[in-house]
Regions:
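A composition-driven surface/loop motif
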Residues: 1-198
Length: 198
């Protein structure tokens, strides 16, 4: 695998049985990762990673504490994309800042059965196409691909500024009993809260 040599960094899997328990990436390709079949049990930080990931068939049981399937910008020749055309994919995410299916570009789902459990089931920076198949997010069937990038909650607003100042004191009493025309001080302005997006 060499990131500066486009013909390299491809992974193609046509079938087989795979069981992995690793600390980093289970299946990693710099350019294209294509899987046409097989049985996969993967426990990893990122179970499947590449620039363009295409899954046509297979059975996947993925457990991850970072990204279950991650399309990242590893090659300049492809737009980061997760394309799923078939298969049965079960993804279980650990708690924390994790994503079931994460794409720095697009997600295309044309078929298959996908079940994702976790705080963030899908996260993508580009567009999502749901043309066929079945998707479950935390046990609930959905009719469109959610996006954690668009659904994050904003943080709490900032505290207001100081309260207004006290009014000014009146002028000194003049001889003859009348009080001078000292003007009250203007009240101070309250500061505006700051909304922080989460």
């Amino acid at each position: 695998e060499k990131e500066d040599d486009d013909p390299l960094g491809y992974i193609y899997i046509g079938g087989g049985n795979f069981s992995m328990n690793v600390g980093d990436d289970g299946i990693h390709g710099t350019s294209v990762v294509q899987i046409d079949g097989g049985q996969f049990t993967i426990n990893a930080a990122e179970c499947i990673e590449g620039t363009y990931i295409r899954i046509n068939d297979g059975t996947f049981d993925l457990s991850s504490w970072d990204d279950g399937i991650n399309a990242a910008k590893k090659s300049d020749s492809y737009t980061p994309t997760v394309e799923i055309n078939g298969g049965t994919i079960n993804i279980t995410m650990s708690a924390g800042d994790t994503d079931g299916i994460d794409s720095n570009g697009n997600i295309i789902i044309n078929g298959g059965t996908i079940s994702v459990s976790g705080n963030s089931t899908f996260d993508y920076d580009g567009t999502a196409q749901f043309n066929g198949g079945t998707i479950y997010c935390n046990g609930q069937q959905v009719t469109e691909i959610p996006n954690q990038m668009m659904g994050g909650r904003g943080g709490m607003g900032g505290m207001g500024g100081n309260t207004g100042g006290f009014g000014g004191r009146g002028g000194q009493r003049r001889p003859g009993g009348q009080r001078g025309g000292g003007r009250p001080g203007a009240p101070g302005r309250c500061g505006r809260g700051v909304w922080v997006r989460g």
